[in-house]
Amino acid sequence: MKISNVYIGGWFQRTMLQLSEIYDFLRESKSELNLEQKKLDEYRKNLLIGNINYGISGEEYVYFTTALGINVKIFEDGLIILNNKSVTEDTLFTDIDKVQDYYENNLSPALNYLFSLGAPVPKELAGIKNVYPYFVVCDKATQEQMQDLLVRTEKQKYFEFKNDKYNVIRGDKYYFINNKTQSDEKIERYIEEQIFIREFKGQLHRYLNIHRIIWEKIDEVKENSKVKGKDIVKFTTKLEAYAKTINLIDGRIKQMGTYIPTREKIAKSDEELAEFLEISGYRYETLKDTLQYIQYLWSMTQNYVSAAQKQFEGIKSDVTSKSVNSLTIVTSMSAGAAILGLFQKSKPEFTIFGVMYFFILTLVGWGSQKILNIISNKQKYDVTDVEYEKDIK
């Protein structure tokens, strides 16, 4: 059995503006931003670049080869595809690791530094870990050979479809494509679209999980009914961090809708690619619906965090007000005692008793304030919440 190619890839939201910046960096190690030239040179050198081309295939892209035999294609919407044609059946997993290692340790650090200024990318914001789909392309393999590949790599098969031009077996991480008569270009176009789809869905799924986690953490605090004074600042700081992350991710979610129409238009204009996607059961409408669902859900998350922030800010204000009142009482007691002392003598005299009296008065004031602070920190404040109305008529 001949294995002709292996692919991996990823997707980060980009535009043709960033693509031109990538092109300048790849060609001349140049950037218009305030980045260290020495680092730019080091990152570019580490890419081991051979030839560089700028082309258009539905979208603009940059393509370059490397001294390792790995080819890289970066599209204007941020889709990144890497492949390695120097692959055999015996060295399959080593060849895949080679591509993944280049992606993680050569290409990604270079692009991360190139775009290190400005808002963080979605994968950093959401803590998204790369779980690559591996695409293994075979030439005219038998059904038994394809099944053997599946057994060696996956515990279960998700789906399989076949026609006169190709067969596709999909597991969890691996796609096995048996190319019968289809051109390499068409196979690659299908792989590009599948990587975009998986990455898009993966980001949305992570945002769904973040919504669940944040909602649950806020609910845990509210379910306690009371919170100690010393914990209020900790909770408000945590909520501020949630709010900041949520607002940044919100901007990225709103961007995602701009990429679907372009990809959909390009795919549907290519009859063979449209057929490929149709057979695999993919619908762009489903992706749009899922995005819209996450957008509505994210709006709810923002509102929920905002309401929790207002609630804890109110409690924080109450604690501050009580602390000020306590300090006022202690200060008034100290001042009153000092004034009474002045009335006991016709004129003040410097005596050992006076010094001790002043020291004791100061100690009492300091001790009183400490005690009040301890009481304030340990005092529990009500965290009230309005219950859901379950019987709306």
Q: At which residue positions do the language-model features occur?
A:
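Generic detector of short, locally flexible boundary/turn motifs and exposed helical patches
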Residues: 34-50, 134, 139-144, 265-267, ...
